[in-house]
Amino acid sequence: MDLRNQYLVRSEPYYHAVGDEIERFEAAYANRIPMMLKGPTGCGKSRFVEYMAWKLGKPLITVACNEDMTAADLVGRFLLDKEGTRWQDGPLTTAARIGAICYLDEVVEARQDTTVVIHPLTDHRRILPLDKKGEVVEAHPDFQIVISYNPGYQSAMKDLKTSTKQRFAAMDFDYPAPEVESEIVAHESGVDAATAKKLVEVAIRSRHLKGHGLDEGISTRLLVYAGSLITKGIAPLIACEMALICPITDDPDLRYALRAAAQTLFA
């Protein structure tokens, strides 16, 4: 299979637009402007990027960033095999060569000295120097970089350099309005509308606890997990315990408060 076709999104991902984010992204892509998506965990940033890659008909290469990731993990390295030494492109280099959308998920998890390798690709130059190989890759006309992160987890140690931020246009994401979120949960998990609405209400109550013991409220993703368990015959209160309460806190008092909310709604 052609390398470009290998990374195409084959079927339409489900994405419920909550505003004009699709039109904004299309305008940015038309001008090959690098994009920064900011929002809480599980609010739909990654699904949005996947949907836009499908809609634009472009390959998508996703990199889950982490603190152990090095610049070589992005651009590539020399490898030894039985025939000798060969160069292996990293995901960023592959995306630049084939004209893919390169999505760096949770980019602030990577070290700052790693993320600076994207700088030449995010200005007028649109090049990627491969110093170890002595090559300069000129980005394919279709290439675009998209990064995402959760601003709620920012700290002095985990933030983007100003010189990096100012190379991107940005869009803020948040959890959808309750009626929209209920529709998403019902569609993705298969639960009925009434159950989806109750699950969303549990999540809303948890989000009110952000900064009061919880770093983050219950995400839309976790609501889909809970709904999926319910459709497989798990009792709603047990599904809430498994998918909504246990994953986000170990604090007994917070768990008690969330259980009480679930019991009120599903009694």
UniProtKB/Swiss-Prot annotation:
GO terms for molecular function: ATP binding; ATP hydrolysis activity. The keyword Hydrolase does not apply. ATP binds at residues 39-46, 99-106. Pfam families: AAA_5, CbbQ_C. The keyword ATP-binding applies. SUPFAM superfamilies: P-loop containing nucleoside triphosphate hydrolases. Keywords: ATP-binding, Nucleotide-binding. Coiled coil: none annotated. Belongs to the CbbQ/NirQ/NorQ/GpvN family. May affect the post-translational activation and/or assembly of the oligomeric structure of RuBisCO. This is Protein CbbQ. It comes from Hydrogenophilus thermoluteolus. The gene is cbbQ.
